[in-house]
Amino acid sequence: NNNEDSIKIGRGYISMFQQSLANKNWAEAYMNWKWIFKNAPFAVNGTYTQGPLMFYYLITTEKDEAKKLAYFNEMMSIFEARTKNLDALNSFAKTKSTMGDVLASKAEFYNWTAPNVKNSGYTLNKSYDNYKQAITTINEKGGREIEGSVLQTFFMISDAMYKANAKADSKANPFRTHYLQDY
């Protein structure tokens, strides 16, 4: 039966993906992740939750800038797909994710990787906006407790934005109002 064969093949890729992650064999994990993401995107939540960590390691160890950028773009596509399909993914997840949780994870992985990837479009302002959106979403719509590392990084970025916009007259700083609201 073709359906049974497809299921067996899919389970094999999932098993190899999980084993590759456990062995920290990022290149092998990537090959299996890619098949799962394309052919069985709802087969396992780890495609979305563990995929970004795999990409983080692929990006930090890759020397070729074009490959780094391709990995970065694929990693960001995980968050787009996850936010789009969150309800369907939660329908079979043991631990449900909220939109705020996903956005906080996206902000973290963007901030950890984008500054080190040429042509990623990284800006301090975009990093700030990602964190602000995540924290606002969690506060308005609920989510898990905001992790201390997320808040700490957000405050550090907010402080950097304030300093980048500093003028001799601190009241003339266009970011001042946002900065005060962040705290």
Give the positions of each predicted feature.
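Preference for long, solvent-exposed alpha-helical segments and helix-linker "stalks"
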Residues: 1-183
